[in-house]
């Protein structure tokens, strides 16, 4: 029987759809379904494998879950997703962090859901708080706190001010303590989703006497698009579970104090 002439785009889409739906695609099954030769489908799968869309196996291909997982780490989750994810752990971390704030101190608070939980707990009206996050500014204003709001361009699904004006404003401050949050950490350091957010975090760290990273354990071992800084730029890490031994050793060598939130 002569094999049909099926456009390459149709064949490739059929393979990807099978992998997406079932996790695996068989050369013989796809060839039979489309009425083309197995050699043609093998070449198509080789192409998809070389491009990283699938993992080539003997007789077929399966989904590249590792690639999909890595790609998802580069994309910032929605505000709604982050607000509900590991919320109890974030509350515990925030409860430990708020104890570090001294009366009449000047404090910097980064953006993010853990930082929001921290801001919700601050009740000392003698504390001066600098924060670029609009949602955090609102919760602080509701609690009648002393807030300094940087100028700049508003950006992000979790809106905050960013850009050169924001950085210049922050550089005029000296903070007793800065509370930072990132998308993830590996042994190579701290990572986040965008260059603009990373620049704000670097500035807060540079202007602070003490730098506290608040991070729930789901972010340990996760990288993202932009490396923000190394562990030598923080003094305290507050998390909710013990770190992997290798990472704990790196932090110990740098004299970073690791606090497990009760």
What are the language-model segments listed below?
Residues 107, 111-113:
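Glycine-rich N-terminal segment of FAD-binding domains in flavoprotein oxidoreductases
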Residues 128-129, 177:
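A residue-level structural signature of the nucleotidyltransferase/glycosyltransferase Rossmann-like core
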Residues 2-34, 39, 43-107, 119-124, ...:
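HTH-adjacent hinge/linker in prokaryotic transcriptional regulators
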Residues 114-118, 220-223:
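Short glycine/serine/threonine-rich phosphate/pyrophosphate-binding segments
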Residues 2-28, 35-38, 50, 56, ...:
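Conserved phosphate- and dinucleotide-binding cores of soluble alpha/beta proteins
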């Amino acid at each position: 029987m002569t094999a049909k002439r099926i456009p390459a785009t149709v064949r490739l889409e059929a393979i990807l759809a099978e992998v997406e739906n079932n996790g695996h695609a068989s050369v013989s099954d796809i060839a039979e379904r489309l009425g083309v030769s197995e050699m043609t489908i093998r070449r198509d799968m080789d192409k998809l494998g070389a491009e990283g869309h699938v993992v080539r196996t003997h007789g077929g291909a399966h989904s590249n879950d590792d690639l999909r997982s890595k790609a998802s780490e580069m994309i910032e989750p929605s505000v709604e997703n982050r607000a509900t994810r590991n919320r109890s752990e974030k509350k515990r971390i925030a409860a430990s962090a708020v104890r570090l704030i001294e009366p009449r101190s000047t404090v910097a608070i980064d953006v993010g859901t853990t930082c929001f939980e921290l801001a919700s707990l601050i009740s000392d009206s003698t504390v001066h708080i600098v924060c670029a996050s609009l949602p955090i500014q609102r919760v602080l204003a509701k609690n009648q706190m002393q807030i300094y709001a940087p100028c700049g361009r508003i950006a992000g699904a979790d809106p905050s001010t960013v850009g050169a004006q924001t950085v210049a404003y922050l550089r005029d401050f000296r903070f007793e303590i800065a509370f930072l949050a990132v998308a993830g950490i590996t042994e190579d350091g701290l990572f986040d989703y965008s260059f603009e957010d990373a620049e704000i975090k670097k500035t807060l760290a540079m202007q602070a006497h003490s730098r506290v990273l608040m991070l729930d354990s789901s972010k340990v071992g996760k990288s993202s698009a932009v490396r923000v800084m190394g562990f030598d730029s923080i003094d305290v890490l507050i998390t909710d579970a013990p770190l992997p031994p290798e990472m704990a050793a790196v932090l110990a060598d740098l004299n970073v104090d690791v606090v497990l939130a009760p």
